[in-house]
Swiss-Prot record:
Protein name, as recorded: Glutamyl-tRNA(Gln) amidotransferase subunit A
Organism: Rhodopseudomonas palustris (strain HaA2)
EC number assigned by the record: 6.3.5.7
GO CC list: glutamyl-tRNA(Gln) amidotransferase complex
Alphabetized NCBIfam families for the sequence: gatA
Reported function: Allows the formation of correctly charged Gln-tRNA(Gln) through the transamidation of misacylated Glu-tRNA(Gln) in organisms which lack glutaminyl-tRNA synthetase. The reaction takes place in the presence of glutamine and ATP through an activated gamma-phospho-Glu-tRNA(Gln).
Subunit details: Heterotrimer of A, B and C subunits.
UniProt lineage: Bacteria, Pseudomonadati, Pseudomonadota, Alphaproteobacteria, Hyphomicrobiales
Top-level class of the enzyme under EC nomenclature: ligase
Length: 492
């Protein structure tokens, strides 16, 4: 029998419908894989009993011919999504053993469509990080290794658990969130596909907030088709989220294999960085040639305010985080450390509950919002954000269908290798991705090649607002040209 954990989500869906195997068998195969891969630390909570119950229910629905689009498909859920009655911590000590009394809109839509919950996935604490090293549960280990090396590598962040679990065959797909690259960067580091949809495409209700004007949920999966299938279930209007946009959800899967003939693909000159590795530059040009061979037209474009995006992002995001994280005080839920009075209790709780990177960003955010610095920093960053958005609008107004860039400035690096003395070194990982969040646009990362040490590298496609379909069509061209990337199993 085929190893059920090696199937794509689309193959598993078809196998379930054709009765080649049952949802319970598919779920059990993934639960066994999770148990054998605990060294990767991808899951922070496993839910085997719940998973089997959901799989049995899916089998019953399939038998009656009433299975939903994801009936029996085992998924992992980033620990930022509220799951009713199931521990949700954002991988922070401050939330302790919090069990939400409600379900996030995105996960409730996945369960509505018949998906199975395997467990909660590791992430950077409150989604603040680019390497999944800030989690209170410890770092996630990338299933990929450098050729001939046993050095443990990061999977990227903040959705490192999601990307590692998908790459290692520990789920058929995973939910993730992206505030400045947290879907696309880990996807690139693990040879998986990750799409950050247009801001407002997926509901943020029930997702622990980092920076509310930047956060967006999306899927990580093994193929472009799988990510399209998942986004179809995750997307949709939600009146409970004031930033949710009321637009019909297209059939994203139908975009796979769609013609890209005549599409204009922008190559932004500002993304050619000084000191960019030759491998990344070569891969970028190779991706452009693949799209050209499929009938697309390449045009050089200019996004002049790109160089200001990273500093502006690291003002806007911490400012919003400092406001959002003020709700964690130990009074109604989560960890509480008592003090002589309520102010001391707040101080003790936050000192013990928040990790170092979260504290750093709260401090930065509070500083840039303070009376003396608001105009100099926060207001100026918002003006830069408007200019970045305008750059993209002008580009798309010239008939450009999508923009092709590298996804990351390097392949995965070693755990503990970056950001120790200088946090900016870590922040630079987001250099190709933050502009997309600042402008509220959709972006997809697709694996496109390997570096000299055999590690996967990804390319990013940036699209017009609510035109994820074009990204899926173009992403499919890259995937068909580059092939799929699967790590050699060393952990079991």
């Amino acid at each position: 029998m085929t190893d059920l954990t090696s199937l794509t989500l689309a193959e598993a869906r078809d196998g379930l419908v054709n009765k080649s195997f049952t949802a319970v068998e598919l779920t059990d195969a993934h639960l066994a894989a999770i148990e054998a891969a605990r060294v990767l630390n991808a899951y922070v909570l496993e839910t085997p009993d719940q998973a089997r119950q959901m799989a049995q229910a899916a089998d019953a629905q399939i038998a009656k011919g009433e299975g939903g689009p994801l009936a029996g498909i085992p998924l992992g859920i980033k620990d930022l999504f509220a799951t009713k009655g199931t521990r949700t911590t954002a991988c922070s000590k401050i939330l302790g053993d919090f069990k939400p009394p409600y379900e996030s809109t995105v996960t409730s839509q996945l369960w509505r469509d018949g998906a199975v919950l395997l467990g909660k996935l590791n992430n950077d604490e409150f989604a603040m990080g680019s390497s999944n090293e800030t989690s209170c549960f410890g770092p996630v280990v990338n299933p990929w290794r450098r050729a001939g090396s046993e050095t443990k590598l990061v999977p990227g962040g903040s959705s490192g658990g999601s990307a590692a679990a998908v790459a290692a065959g520990l789920c058929l797909g995973a939910t993730a969130t992206d505030t400045g690259g947290s879907i696309r960067q880990p996807a690139a580091f693990t040879g998986t596909v990750g799409i950050k949809p247009t801001y407002g495409r997926c509901s943020r209700w029930g997702i622990v907030a980092f920076a509310s004007s930047l956060d967006q949920a999306g899927p990580i999966a093994r193929t472009v088709r799988d990510s399209a299938i998942l986004l179809g279930s995750m997307a949709g209007f939600d009146p409970k989220d004031t930033t949710s946009v009321d637009r019909p959800v297209p059939n994203y899967e139908a975009a796979i294999g769609g013609s890209v003939k005549g599409m204009k693909i922008g190559i932004p000159k500002e993304y050619r960085l000084d000191g960019m590795p030759a491998e990344i530059e070569k891969l970028w040009m190779q991706g452009a040639e693949w799209l050209k061979a499929a009938g697309a037209e390449l045009v050089e474009v200019s996004l002049p305010h790109t160089k200001y995006a990273l500093p502006a992002y690291y003002i806007v995001a911490p400012a919003e985080a400092s406001s959002n994280l003020a709700r964690y005080d130990g009074v109604r839920y989560g960890t509480r450390v008592n003090g002589r009075n309520i102010v001391e209790m707040y101080e003790n709780t936050r000192a013990a509950g928040f990790g170092a990177e979260v504290k750093r960003r709260i401090m930065i955010g509070t500083y840039v919002l303070s009376a003396g610095y608001y105009d100099a920093y926060y207001l100026r960053a918002q003006k830069v954000r408007t200019l970045i958005k305008r750059d993209f609008e002008q580009c798309f107004d010239q008939g450009v269908s999508a923009i092709l860039t590298p996804a990351t400035p390097s392949a995965a690096f070693g755990i503990g290798e970056k950001g120790g003395a200088d946090p900016v070194e870590m922040y630079l990982n987001d250099i190709f991705t933050v502009t997309v969040n600042m402008a509220g646009l959709p972006g997809i990362a697709v694996p496109a090649g390997s570096d000299s040490q055999g590690l996967p590298l990804g390319l990013q496609l940036i699209g017009r607002p609510f035109d994820e379909e074009t990204l899926f069509s173009l992403g499919d061209v890259i995937e068909q040209s580059a092939g799929r990337f699967t790590p050699a199993k060393w952990w079991a």
